[in-house]
Amino acid sequence: MSEDYVLEMIDITKEFPGVKALDGVQLKVKRGTVHALMGENGAGKSTLMKILIGIYTPDRGKIILDGEELKVSTIKHALDRGISMIHQELSPVPNMTVAENIFLGREPSYPFAGWVKMKELVKKTRQLFERLEIDIDPNAKMADLSIANMQMVEIAKAISYHSKLIIMDEPTSAITEKEVHHLFRIIRSLKKEGVSIIYITHKMDELEQITDEVTVLRDGKYIGTKPSHQMTRDELIQMMVGRELNQIFHKPKVPIGEVALSVQGLTKKGKFHDVSFEVRKGEIVGFAGLMGSGRTEVLESVFGVTKPDAGDIYVHGKKATIRSTRDAIRYGMGLLTEDRKLTGLFLPLSVEDNMITVTVNQYTKAGFLQQRKIREDCQRLAEQLSIKTPSLQQLIKYLSGGNQQKALIARWLLHNPDILFLDEPTRGIDVGAKAEIYHLIFELAKNGKAIIVVSSEMPEILGLSDRVIVMHEGRKMGELTREEATQERIMQLATGQLIETKR
């Protein structure tokens, strides 16, 4: 092995019942570099990383760390050898302090008594934070931290294990641009110390900003590795999906119909104030804004998740009284939530069971479920949406993020709503699955659905929307037509600057 490499994974193969998750995959990471691992959801990235940190055992292949073959049997074994992973779904102990989370199970303690030396624990945490330029109180409760700060704590925890190799899974998926810059500063600092990072992302613009090399997997196979600065966007997409995607957004011309939903003066103290908008049949309205701008909160209030303090909602021209999500569903609404794992999926249930949670009463006759009808309808939608699963009885937690998201969309298609709210519909989803979901959204609009899309991805807002509503600190700052909407104009409004538009 070349001395340049801190890690080599060679000919890694892993099979599960009915599916070969990895087939002869390789990954080589140079010391002191950031190595991007990319591929569609279901390409094998997660399985490969789970093998590296000891969750799975490969059926074939070998792992070489610092020139020595390594057989990783447990997560603790991986940590002891200097390999740690920061997961996309953070799971801190919320009622413990920052310092206690970092050194959990390794707390400095008094001999015999077993009491934790709290002052020493806090001191070690402060020293770690100073090294990483992290400004967080070691005594703060984890439950009180933002997602970005939780992430910083996880990085500090990884460094506290003297990790030589850190895996970061979608580290920028839920943090602001300012927080991303801070994260990148820390990553560059770690590189200078000789730490290597495997960086899993779907955001192509991050490749040149922070990574040195890119490895692409597709359908459980190794496709190739190239220096990041030599990889064009088109080439990367071609490697990831196995086909060219010259245009992801093929927006068909759709006749815009009558107003399906009108919201007037919606207000919730501390969240949003005097928000008014409407969406018509066949129209896609994008909600843009920075994190914390109130976009999600407005949709949740319209959908009955929370109760507004003031405002009126009209559905098809008639005033609607919505006190619960059940009321919203009766009015023909559907909501794809922002966090599919936290508020969307029932992870212990099957794909089929997740698809029918909203419509289960429609399939009940004389107190019995119409299993054949359920199976037929779910199978039809699974084929229509290209949901990749060995069976509809497969537990949904085993599906890739993109396929989980499609199953949630299928849930609402079974309900057949007139008005559909899509909150971050492609978060954590690869480019191929995104294209499929965009096509589906356009088809829904073509069929007369009124659609509102909340997205933090600018190309998504610009590519999908007939109109763009921009929020800033709980207020509607402006509304742009498709022709008026540009990245610069949206960012101006999103940061609180007023601009002149036709409206």
From Swiss-Prot:
Main location as per UniProt: membrane
Keywords in alphabetical order: ATP-binding, Cell membrane, Membrane, Nucleotide-binding, Repeat, Sugar transport, Translocase, Transport
Record flagged with keyword RNA-binding: no
SMART domains in the cross-refs: AAA
Highest taxon above the source species: Bacteria
Function per UniProt: Part of an ABC transporter complex involved in carbohydrate import. Could be involved in ribose, galactose and/or methyl galactoside import. Responsible for energy coupling to the transport system.
UniProt-recorded name of the protein: Putative ribose/galactose/methyl galactoside import ATP-binding protein
Gene source species: Geobacillus kaustophilus (strain HTA426)
